[in-house]
Amino acid sequence: MTLNLCVLTPNRIVWDSEVKEIILSTNSGQIGVLANHAPIATAVDIGILKIRLANQWLTMALMGGFARIGNNEITILVNDAEKNSDIDPQEAQQTLEIAEANLRKAEGKRQTIEANLALRRARTRVEALNTI
């Protein structure tokens, strides 16, 4: 049995195809979804989406949003998403280093929160390259 997975951002459809299984980062931890999963709506955290096709796993960096699962349909709406194959390793590493530097020099609560979020996004992109 398969699931139909659709990953959407405000600007584009990132993925729309059948899959065997996914592992999704939610605000309360990771969940695995197979065919005939119980219906659920959940917040999606900044993190990795693992997608299993027949015998192959793919990864995607997700930048927060929400997901709806039901009737073997998974719709994930996120602020941004990148397949690991679309991420430039050098650019991702450079962005991570900049985010770490910005966090070190952040002043005040607002700057610190924004710098932490940027760092989480940068780490997720690097992690997507190194997962599976």
Swiss-Prot record:
The modification N-acetylthreonine is found at T2. It is found in: Plastid, Chloroplast thylakoid membrane. GO terms for cellular component: chloroplast; chloroplast envelope; chloroplast thylakoid; chloroplast thylakoid membrane; plastid; proton-transporting ATP synthase complex; thylakoid. GO terms for molecular function: ATP binding; mRNA binding; proton-transporting ATP synthase activity, rotational mechanism. InterPro entries: ATP_synth_F1_dsu/esu, ATP_synth_F1_dsu/esu_N, ATP_synth_F1_esu_C, ATPsynth_dsu/esu_N. It is a peripheral membrane protein. Keywords: Acetylation, ATP synthesis, CF(1), Chloroplast, Hydrogen ion transport, Ion transport, Membrane, Plastid, Thylakoid, Transport. Gene3D superfamilies: 6.10.140.480, F0F1 ATP synthase delta/epsilon subunit, N-terminal. Pfam families: ATP-synt_DE, ATP-synt_DE_N. Produces ATP from ADP in the presence of a proton gradient across the membrane. HAMAP family: ATP_synth_epsil_bac. Belongs to the ATPase epsilon chain family. F-type ATPases have 2 components, CF(1) - the catalytic core - and CF(0) - the membrane proton channel. CF(1) has five subunits: alpha(3), beta(3), gamma(1), delta(1), epsilon(1). CF(0) has three main subunits: a, b and c. This is ATP synthase epsilon chain, chloroplastic. It comes from Arabidopsis thaliana. The lineage of its organism: Eukaryota, Viridiplantae, Streptophyta, Embryophyta, Tracheophyta. The gene is atpE.
